[in-house]
Amino acid sequence: MHSLLRPSRFSANQSVLCLLQRHRVFFSSISVKPRKRMVYCVVSYRGTGFAGLQYNANVKTIQDTLFQAFARVGAVVQVNADSPKKIRMCSAARTDKGVHAIVNVLGLKVLDNQPLPHVVNLVNDILPPCIRVWKMARTFNSFSPHTVCDSRVYEYWLPVSSLLTPRPCTLEAYVIAKASEKAFPINETLSHLANLSKQDCVANSLSEPFRLSKPKLDFLKHACTMFRGTHRFHSYTTEKGFSDASSRRFLLDVRVDNLHIDKLNRQWVKLIFHGQSFMKHQIRKMVGILIHLTRTGWNAQVLLNTFNNSYRIRIPRAPAEFLLLNQPIFQAFNKKCSRFDHEPVEWSCAQKGIDQFAHSFLRTPMFDCFISSESFQSFFILQKQFQLFQDLALLTSFDFLEPSSRRDILGEK
């Protein structure tokens, strides 16, 4: 009696087998989800010919070029190979069109199907020589380089000839002289300005050997210190207003780092900008006003007025091809990595290759193309300089240095 009520083992197995056969189509359609891991990626690149770092549809960018390379080597699953957002690809620092990077750090999710050093080699074989991947390493799944980055360090290589005092008998020298006398003939100047050609507006000695005098160098060093600390940089970007809280930025250091003489006997000054974060065009506009103040001998205290006045100053942007992202800083995040036994974000193992890349693909071409690019020539078109001169005059009521100090800076007798 009990044996009849108890189902046999054979009948139970047979029922399971029938159920599996009935749903064999459903089970065959199930695939194992590929395993992905968050990694950080250390890269260097030359920004010439690219529309910046950030991915932008139908535009050639650094991030898109890297993403396509990762997809081609099989580091990205096929269904995610149409957008970097699907693999959470982001960078520690953003660079604008034409700006280079000695070191930048990206975060992205890649398939855990091959060793990361092997992926680096495969990607570098596909990438153009102006973009290099130096290292990939596993990190936290929540890693976002833009968020955990403490600060960014940029460098700007300024040709010393761009700091040359305007030549006598030029319109620019005439405007400066009249302003120093507190007589500013705007109507007369504008009538002359309309008849100027490009050659008349450009300092013709940009490519000639020129050495920065000690008074000019001291003035430039002092002007750089005015940027340190927390200020409103609304006049140094195109996207923020005076009342916008995000226009307040903290700069840890702005300084003159060193002087360099290239193979054509031209002197360059290296400026360092170290801050928590920077806005669009901020550094290039900071360099632009530093050039103007050093050339004209304007009181460096005027920089404080650009921070504290709601009026937006029309500052011309210095050329982009002389701006380099030196490195992002991850000091706080690396301390966290040591506590949780994760590899810190560092690239000492590739430092030799990075230095060689920076010399061969960034600084040397930058020095060589200085004359042919004509970027500084267009920067010195008097129309742009005249607008800046007007705006500074409105802020300061022509608050120049004392005549004796001004003569020392300008090299006048």
Curated annotation (Swiss-Prot):
GO CC term (a single one): nucleus
Major enzyme class: isomerase
Gene Ontology terms for molecular function: lyase activity; pseudouridine synthase activity; RNA binding; tRNA pseudouridine synthase activity
Cellular compartment(s): Cytoplasm; Nucleus
Swiss-Prot/TrEMBL catalytic activity: a uridine in tRNA = a pseudouridine in tRNA
Active site: 96 (nucleophile)
Chain segments annotated as coiled-coil in the UniProt record: none
InterPro entries (UniProt xref): PsdUridine_synth_cat_dom_sf, PsdUridine_synth_TruA, PsdUridine_synth_TruA_a/b_dom, PsdUridine_synth_TruA_C, PUS1/PUS2-like, TruA/RsuA/RluB/E/F_N
Similarity remark: Belongs to the tRNA pseudouridine synthase TruA family.
The protein's name: Putative tRNA pseudouridine synthase C16C4.06c
Protein source organism: Schizosaccharomyces pombe (strain 972 / ATCC 24843)
